[in-house]
Regions:
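C-terminal module of multi-pass small-molecule transporters
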Residues: 1-107, 123-156
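Intrinsic disorder in cytosolic terminal tails and internal cytosolic loops
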Residues: 113-122, 150-165
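Alpha-helical oligomerization interfaces
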Residues: 108-112
Length: 165
């Protein structure tokens, strides 16, 4: 919170989105031979970027609300976060599934050459993951662009509780 107070939500969010996006892109290029430690480190960096985005954006949004609307703002924020997460997951899984399905070998290959089928199916799955992470990177770039529109606003003055109607 001291960093937030010192430099503001905008700079933290921009930095966090940059880290998140930069750490997402390498996932689009993973191979069967990629070491697990590389994936773990990339994932940890992504999570660090997410933490640098979520806290300042949420705090900035709550600071922009008058005190009597904070509970409603929190509820709306939590609802939008859950809905956006669900939609994002559905989109990425759809991309993964469709690209994988389109790249799968013919099923008769499973009977005639099971090892070849396995290799082609693995490559199709990897291509699905590559496509999904590429789409996630595009979402990250869009999110990064949006963070440039954040600005530091002071909290709104407190209104009477009954004035919300």
């Amino acid at each position: 919170s001291r960093i937030f107070d010192k430099i503001g939500a905008r700079r933290l969010a921009i930095t966090g989105m940059f880290i998140l996006t930069a750490a997402t892109l390498p996932f689009a290029f993973l191979t069967k031979a990629t070491p697990i430690i590389y994936i773990i480190v990339l994932y940890a960096i992504r999570m660090f970027g997410i933490s640098m985005v979520m806290m300042p954006v949420t705090t900035s949004g709550m600071n922009a609300l008058p005190m009597n609307l904070l509970s409603h703002g929190t509820a709306v924020n939590n609802t939008f976060r859950q809905v956006a997460s669900s939609i994002g997951t559905a989109v990425l899984i759809s991309v993964l599934t469709n690209v994988t399905k389109d790249g799968l070998p013919a099923s008769d290959l499973l009977k005639t050459a099971p090892l070849t089928y396995r290799d082609q199916a693995t490559n199709a799955t990897l291509n699905g993951y590559h496509a999904a992470f590429f789409v996630a990177t595009i979402f990250g770039v869009l999110g990064l662009a949006i963070t440039f529109f954040l600005n530091k606003k002071e909290a709104m003055p407190v209104k009477e509780v009954g004035a919300m109607k």
